[in-house]
């Protein structure tokens, strides 16, 4: 009761309490608080005030706060014990847990994939800066599971000290080291086996190591390379390759060469290459036409003769189709236009129809005015609704009256034509003589009663007749001369009618096709379980689909992949992208977006590459890379061992006088006589006699020296690498799976503008650095030996088959055994063994393939696997010793540079000292610490526990 009275009195004395904020009143009340004992009622006021946390937080809460204490909202948890919370900043923003963990429901949008790597930062932050655990605690170790719960690293391996804690105290040092080595080997084997089991059913993993799928994929890639090689040789022979230089100033010429290769790879002809000379058309802009009343249109073939009369004759376009038509497109949609009937018949009919339609429109307008006036006078809802319905009907009739009349006449004419053609086929004579007589009579009869539709049939497209004429001349020897002077036959007329649509396709194929220009869609998220066939099944429903490419998965993306879907240029790519975004594959959104065209296809490299000395070095490197890649994919038949000499022995053979084996023997045309350009020449004697040393050149530098002959040789090698092997030499990289990407031969790096002068030191440094960057192409991939794979846990096929037989042999009772594969019972295990090898041979073959599958994975020195846990690597003594306070401290910063909201530098106290913790005192080195001095009585007895 006393508390209530005191509170009431204090509120009554507060004169301006309605004009002040809660925080201001709180501070004033805090100032008026007497310094009494803890039993005072006013000392407990802060506990009841939700905006006061000084006393409850612990640690001398006398300071005023200008914001609420967020620690009061934590609920019943451990409170901070140190420091003054008066000036504390709010805690860092709580990160969401990982989507793949079991305690939280995964996000259905990404199917368990963490695209922003928030879990890595969350684990790191919670282990160091959490208010609920001290900084000296070890970070939580996340175990690796299957593909769904796969972590970003392997679990932490025990160090030697931790391993010793699990062993007996009386164990010897040699025994400890032996057991620890076995532990590390078993740990590595276990991780490889777990990774294999987690990913063996995924398509990308099968394409790499499965004994059947990997061979099929390798043959497919080799077929792509063979096709590229044929195209390059063709362009090399016709002079296209030799007419261009790999310089950035010749960007247009380089792009033309690359586009020529793409058109050839797509199956284009020399006629299609003319599309490169045409100005690229603007990207069509699509608009959706909204028209009511679905009405079917009758399409007729437009005659090329009538193109000049197209504007004069009325064109009937169906208003019902909600089709998507591109704007600013002339001939791309020429076959979608509806042709008009011949001018002779249409000239008279529209006049009569127009006059009738004008009379109708006048009557309708007058009736409309009357209805408007009557609608103003009357106020009934029925009259207004009926008038609105009449207006809608009149609008529709007004719009479609003329078209309906013409459409009905066209249908009648089409039926007449069909009946006449059927009559001609039925009355076809047996002998050629009778055929000529009967057909002549039919022509005369048809001239007497000729309809407008028959005139349109007589005026067939000229191009279609020219295409079919040679074939028809060979098949039909007898011709008929009509009154108009044209030669025709019955079979010719029938063939023209039957192959009318095919002829239109031939007409369109005669135009150059821009096969190098495509439209594409980028898929951001593809689960590892999604196969290429599933994506193709979704995309084949859209017209213009060409191919799909799927990238290899990345460990930092939780083995999610990216994809590119390629379509022809004339499709509405945005509509397809919208449709793909509304679909899900295996409960995973693909994240489809439109892929833009390449902005800069020719990009400049360092201009020092044009120097003669650098060019000679580049020729040597290019030749080595070409030899290595050609041998890897077996593009050219290998020459005999006597004919091929490596680079290092080429000089020795020439010095011994063996000129027959001089150089490198290869059937690759770009490597013919390549060794002649690898031998460096210099005027050493002349420079020595004239006293021209290289000291001045090193100090001042020398101008860039270009050798056009060497550059021409290098350009052939660079273009061969780019076109055939998809290796961009001046960017020291390879563009993988380029044959399935939207842009084949898309980007190339060329020599940029050369500097004025260059020193020899710069040249040597550049050559050395560039060779190190190209080591991935220079070194041959060697598989691991059997002994090395055995150490990694390689399996034996017969041993695994025996394990399979034992696992499927179950003893039910005495002399009663069961085979789980078939459910049959046998008297002994030997009968089950015989039964498995006879009746379940495919299961045994699967076991053998599984063993080969696993061993292929182990033999790859660049096999994919989870990276080692940071705690498994050796750490410096400063972190693991006395100064760290913990066995392992993860890196201070997250993988990205930005820190979460609310993060302050005061919270970065050496990986410890988070919220409400005092800053950790750094210990000084031993020589800077104050030496403790002990005082003792000389008369006292000796004490071993005194200071020095």
Curated annotation (Swiss-Prot):
Any single biological process term in GO: siRNA processing
Highest taxon listed in the record's lineage: Eukaryota
Family matches, as InterPro entries: SE/Ars2, SERRATE/Ars2_C, SERRATE/Ars2_N
GO cellular component term of the entry, any: nucleoplasm
Pfam families with a match to the protein in the record: ARS2 (PF04959), SERRATE_Ars2_N (PF12066)
Biased composition (Basic residues): 362-372
Annotated positions of the Phosphoserine modification: 84, 329, 431, 644
Residues that bear Phosphotyrosine: 82
Keywords of this entry: Nucleus, Phosphoprotein, RNA-mediated gene silencing
Biased composition annotated in UniProt, kind: Acidic residues: 329-338
Basic and acidic residues bias (residue ranges): 8-34, 41-50, 95-106, 274-312, 342-361, 394-447, 458-497
Subcellular location: Nucleus
Positions of region (Disordered): 1-106, 274-497, 856-893
Job of this protein: Acts as a mediator between the cap-binding complex (CBC) and RNA-mediated gene silencing (RNAi). Involved in innate immunity via the short interfering RNAs (siRNAs) processing machinery by restricting the viral RNA production. Also involved microRNA (miRNA)-mediated silencing by contributing to the stability and delivery of primary miRNA transcripts to the primary miRNA processing complex containing drosha and pasha.
Oligomer and partners: Interacts with cbp20, Dcr-2 and pasha.
Family, per entry: Belongs to the ARS2 family.
Name this protein carries in UniProt: Serrate RNA effector molecule homolog
Organism: Drosophila ananassae (Fruit fly)
Record lineage: Eukaryota, Metazoa, Ecdysozoa, Arthropoda, Hexapoda
Gene for this chain: Ars2
